[in-house]
């Protein structure tokens, strides 16, 4: 996402470290002026444990923000990607410190060897997403429809939080450097701390790159 501030990066082929301080200017804070937009402090590290396993972790602090049990001041998370030949298994976990129902996680499995530069290559993935009642996906790496920018089930709140569901993804290289990607999201529901969850519509999307 867009970021206005100072950033420091260091690393090698095995380990990468990043630290940053400043303002986010896209995603959940798009359109806010400087007075409305708090600064963030961010640090992350990721690296290869071996040729099959990649691990990562991050910490973010929403400066000058008073946290409560529905919003975060300190946020941290971990991720992993495991690859054996054509099989991929991966997941992410994020926690808003001090928040009630302030966790989010995803886990997935895939098969294939898609390379957009090589005609005929392909892969498929299936992933499950679970965002606690007070967590929303902001500019997610994955193309889920129910992210923070969407309206909630009542149609009155455009900061959508609390979601769980599945996403299937397929990639295929039609020609060298021409790829087709199809997404299908299904079995989607809200993720309330109490009460009955609402069913959400299935969705699909196709991209040509």
Could you tell me what each predicted segment is?
Residues 6-8, 45, 76-80:
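Structured alpha-helical segments in the cores of large, soluble enzyme domains
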Residues 16-19, 23-57, 61-63:
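Solenoidal tandem-repeat scaffolds enriched in leucines and small polar residues
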Residues 1-23, 157, 204-206:
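Outer-membrane beta-barrel channel domains
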Residues 1, 30-35, 68-70, 194-196:
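Short, solvent-exposed loop/turn segments at secondary-structure boundaries
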Residues 2-4, 39, 74, 166:
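Beta-rich catalytic cores
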Residues 51-54, 59-209:
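Outer-membrane beta-barrel pore domains
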Residues 1, 7, 33, 37, ...:
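Short, well-structured alpha-helical patches and their helix-loop capping segments
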